[in-house]
């Protein structure tokens, strides 16, 4: 097997099949694998004991960590053949989806605190770190201790500084409901700042905005993939998204607003949303966040032979296939990766989205270019200077 799996630091030596789904726009990824279960073996009895919420780590073919999580579910099977234990769970940070703020951590209201402050306090209750980052992983090119590695471009530094400023900007007053999950509360706050709530391979929570200017990792075509698909959900999209701020106690009778436009939608389709908390200046971020959310109505699927276990959510790939209406060398961001492995075949399925679906702009690239349009779709400064527009020709 290409992967190495450990439970509480001990290697699982006889797993036969499974899947790992890494997600960007989520606070947790998921895993499942099947392993031979020797019922009389004391080590197996301890390793596969249910309801212990044991720690799991998964390493790729180069023995780099790609997943840190918690075992949730056990399913045991016994028949005339092999006895198997089927183990599944989610990332370390996934617990935030399942728990509300404990009574011991009340009050539920926060005054004059940033989302970083609030997230640090709530995630810290479960031993989870919170990191401000423009990378979906910490394997390479990661923001470390608030400093950007020197090789990162100036534009990327600017993106990171903008993200850091928003993550540390103050909410006047916010409040969680007693039954609301910690994840839902943090996601609500993050959306008002146009920040993505994500996680990395260590199970840390990320306050995240992607680096839209990164170069593509791979170039995928009809010829080097097993399957491709494209779904365009026009009903979910609008040309103009207006955000109106509810009048506050301090600003009674005053309603501020901002508008963000989706340049992919030429027909006039306006909508208006209400910003229920935050500052008056948050309406622009709120509008961009709504456009970003709507852009997820464009979904690209790519199925590949083998395990692409060095690709990670948040990275860019190029896709060129006329049959899914991708006439240009279109840039898409990896939103999810599902790696399926067993004794007979390994496959990887990518879920791709428009990069601006994590920012709302400021410019949304024309992914709808066709051969009747002016040839302005190739972005040489973002792609390699060769005819294939890729920086990894080994995939071709």
Task: Tell me what each language-model feature is.
Residues 1-105, 192-194, 224-225:
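Assembly/oligomerization scaffold segments
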Residues 1-10, 40-77, 108-129, 187, ...:
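Short, acidic/charged, Gly/Pro-enriched secondary-structure junctions
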Residues 2-6, 108, 187, 191, ...:
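Acidic, small/polar-enriched beta strand-loop surface segments
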Residues 15-17, 26-30, 66, 82-84, ...:
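Extracytoplasmic
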Residues 29-33, 137, 349-351:
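Residue-level detection of beta-strand scaffold positions
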Residues 35, 89-91, 209, 245, ...:
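Flexible glycine-/small-residue-rich
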Residues 65-70, 86, 217, 301, ...:
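Well-ordered beta-strand positions in beta-sheet-rich domains
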Residues 84-232, 393-396:
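Charged- and aromatic-enriched interaction segments used to assemble
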């Amino acid at each position: 097997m290409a992967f190495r799996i450990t439970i509480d630091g001990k290697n699982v030596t006889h797993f036969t099949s499974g899947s790992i789904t890494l997600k960007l726009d989520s606070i947790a990824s998921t895993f499942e694998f099947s392993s031979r279960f020797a019922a009389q073996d004391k080590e197996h009895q301890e390793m596969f004991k249910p309801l212990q919420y044991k720690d799991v780590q998964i390493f790729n073919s180069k023995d780099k960590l790609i997943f840190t999580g918690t075992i949730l579910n056990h399913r045991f099977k016994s028949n005339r053949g092999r006895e198997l234990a089927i183990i599944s769970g989610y990332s370390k940070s996934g617990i935030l989806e399942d728990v509300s703020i404990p009574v011991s951590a009340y009050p539920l209201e926060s005054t004059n605190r940033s989302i970083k402050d609030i997230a640090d306090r709530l995630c810290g209750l479960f031993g989870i770190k919170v990191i401000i980052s423009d990378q979906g992983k910490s394997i390479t090119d990661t923001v470390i201790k608030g400093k950007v590695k020197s090789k990162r471009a100036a534009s990327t530094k600017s993106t990171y500084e903008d993200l850091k400023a928003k993550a540390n900007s103050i909410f006047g007053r916010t409040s969680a409901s007693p039954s609301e999950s910690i994840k839902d509360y943090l996601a609500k706050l993050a959306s008002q700042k146009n920040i993505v709530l994500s996680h990395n391979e260590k199970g840390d929570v990320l306050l995240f905005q992607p680096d839209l200017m990164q170069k593509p990792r791979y170039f995928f075509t009809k010829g080097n993939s097993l399957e491709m698909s494209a779904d365009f959900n026009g009903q979910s999209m609008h040309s103009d998204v207006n955000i109106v701020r509810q009048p506050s106690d301090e600003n009674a009778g005053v309603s501020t607003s901002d508008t963000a436009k989706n340049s992919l939608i030429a027909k006039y389709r306006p909508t208006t949303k209400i910003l229920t908390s935050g500052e008056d200046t948050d309406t622009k971020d709120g509008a961009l966040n709504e456009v970003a959310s709507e852009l997820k109505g464009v979904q690209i699927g790519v199925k590949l032979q083998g395990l692409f276990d060095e690709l990670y959510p948040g990275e860019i790939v190029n896709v060129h296939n006329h049959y899914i209406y991708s006439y240009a060398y279109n840039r898409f961001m990896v939103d999810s990766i599902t790696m399926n492995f067993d004794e007979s075949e390994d496959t990887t399925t990518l879920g791709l989205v428009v990069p601006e679906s994590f920012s709302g702009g400021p410019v949304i690239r024309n992914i709808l270019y066709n051969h009747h349009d002016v040839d302005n779709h190739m972005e040489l400064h973002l792609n390699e200077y060769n005819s294939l527009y890729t920086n990894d020709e080994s995939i071709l």
